[in-house]
């Protein structure tokens, strides 16, 4: 099927609105993507005609809701090519998924004197949980440094591993630079040293196919809201043998086998023992619709369209005076930049006046900002519904700002 951006855009109601009297150019999907009608309708239909609490209910609505929820788990497992749907845990998003691993697997496997490796380009969600774990147990946090072009200094990686390395926690794609890390060689090296690997896939799964079996990662986590799905829902993949060994990190209903005041509590099997309480069933239904929508379009077709759009954007941005781009030419999804010495907030405010939505600030990546010695950056992100015309509007807007501000 030929990819048609016009047909895709017609599925997203918000893209027809105006901002400041101008058509909206939404270039902020890396923060959170817009939702197609198919996702909105699926979640609304569930709440209108199918809502009930899942698990243990013998009535029809509960049984149907439970079946729908578990079908989404199966769909998500196919989406990332997991061996089994039971390797997938529903979480609130990438942040909760990483915290789950840190507080369950981490508390059980990382000891004083051990070390964890991350990189200088990580989102705070893949830094802070490991800082907290290391502080709790007396472990060391080691950091892969950056090159100026936004790639990792991979030649340093072998020197960071030793017999005390327990985990490599690495982003698949940088949320600021768009750098796609060479996961295959990094994962192989980690496993050679007996370390596990967690991959933050929040910025990858919407741009091209992901195969967790081919990657051979131990943990992979992503959010639904960046994948055109609802907020408050995400997926944590864990290799089955690891998941079965991990203790729960939250207690409550749905995650127990038995509860006794005199004999204590026993847990149900994974993945359900990591899903305490009433789940975000509506969000799960919406996530399933998003996965179905993206899969029907074809991730390879999406990738081809987005890469062509990215190449066009980078070539057009060369015409903007005093524009600093961060990262290399070969990138996925995002373009981080600053215009002259003007603060990113000022540039972003002007662009908003022109109906163009970009993200401004430190992008939950303060160590990365420190590396480039800037307080903030503007970030334009390109998704499957963005157009060449919107890229041209961004370029024209930046040229206009440069003329106004100098």
Swiss-Prot record:
Cellular compartments per GO CC: cytoplasm
Entry annotation: catalytic residues: 364 (cysteine persulfide intermediate)
PROSITE patterns according to UniProt: AA_TRANSFER_CLASS_5
InterPro entries xrefs: Aminotrans_V_dom (IPR000192), Aminotrans_V_PyrdxlP_BS (IPR020578), Cys_dSase_SufS (IPR010970), PyrdxlP-dep_Trfase (IPR015424), PyrdxlP-dep_Trfase_major (IPR015421), PyrdxlP-dep_Trfase_small (IPR015422)
N6-(pyridoxal phosphate)lysine carried by residues: 226
A single MF term (Gene Ontology): selenocysteine lyase activity
Reactions the enzyme catalyzes: (sulfur carrier)-H + L-cysteine = (sulfur carrier)-SH + L-alanine; L-selenocysteine + AH2 = hydrogenselenide + L-alanine + A + H(+)
Stated role: Cysteine desulfurases mobilize the sulfur from L-cysteine to yield L-alanine, an essential step in sulfur metabolism for biosynthesis of a variety of sulfur-containing biomolecules. Component of the suf operon, which is activated and required under specific conditions such as oxidative stress and iron limitation. Acts as a potent selenocysteine lyase in vitro, that mobilizes selenium from L-selenocysteine. Selenocysteine lyase activity is however unsure in vivo.
Entry protein name: Cysteine desulfurase
Organism: Shigella flexneri
Lineage: Bacteria, Pseudomonadati, Pseudomonadota, Gammaproteobacteria, Enterobacterales
């Amino acid at each position: 099927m030929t990819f048609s951006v016009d047909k895709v855009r017609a599925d997203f109601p918000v893209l027809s609105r105006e901002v400041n009297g101008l058509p909206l150019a939404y270039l902020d999907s890396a923060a959170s993507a817009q939702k197609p009608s198919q996702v909105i309708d699926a979640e609304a239909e569930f709440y209108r005609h199918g809502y009930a609490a899942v698990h243990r209910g013998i009535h029809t609505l509960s049984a149907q809701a439970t079946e729908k929820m578990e079908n989404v788990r199966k769909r998500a497992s196919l989406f990332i090519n997991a061996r089994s749907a039971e390797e997938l845990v529903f979480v609130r998003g990438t942040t909760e998924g990483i915290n789950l691993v840190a507080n369950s697997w981490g508390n059980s496997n990382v000891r004083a004197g051990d070390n964890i490796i991350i990189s200088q380009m990580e989102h705070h969600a893949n830094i802070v949980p490991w800082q907290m774990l290391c502080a709790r147990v007396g472990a060391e946090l080691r950091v892969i440094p950056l090159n100026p072009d936004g790639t990792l200094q991979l030649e340093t990686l072998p020197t960071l591993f030793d017999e005390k390395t327990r985990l490599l926690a690495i982003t698949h794609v940088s949320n600021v630079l768009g750098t796609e890390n060479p996961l295959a060689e990094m994962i192989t090296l980690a496993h050679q040293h007996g370390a596990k690997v967690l991959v933050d896939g929040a910025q990858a799964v919407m741009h091209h196919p992901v195969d967790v079996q081919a990657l051979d990662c131990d943990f992979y986590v992503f959010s639904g809201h960046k994948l055109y799905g609802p907020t408050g829902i995400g997926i944590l993949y864990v290799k089955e043998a690891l998941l079965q060994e991990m203790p729960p990190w939250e207690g409550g209903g749905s995650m127990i086998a038995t509860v006794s005041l005199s004999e204590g509590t026993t847990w149900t099997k994974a993945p359900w023992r990591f899903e305490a309480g009433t789940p975000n069933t509506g969000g799960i239904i919406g996530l399933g619709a998003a996965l179905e929508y993206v899969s029907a379009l074809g991730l390879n077709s999406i990738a081809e369209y987005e890469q062509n759009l990215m190449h066009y954007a980078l070539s057009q941005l060369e015409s903007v005076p005093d524009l600093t781009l961060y990262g290399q030419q070969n990138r996925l999804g995002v373009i981080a930049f600053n215009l002259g010495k003007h603060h990113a907030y000022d540039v972003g405010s002007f662009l908003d006046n022109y109906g163009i939505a970009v993200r401004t600030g430190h992008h939950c990546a303060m160590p990365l900002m420190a590396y480039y010695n800037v307080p903030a950056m503007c970030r334009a992100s390109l998704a499957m519904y963005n157009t060449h015309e919107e890229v041209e509007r961004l370029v024209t807007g930046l040229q206009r700002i440069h003329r106004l501000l100098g």
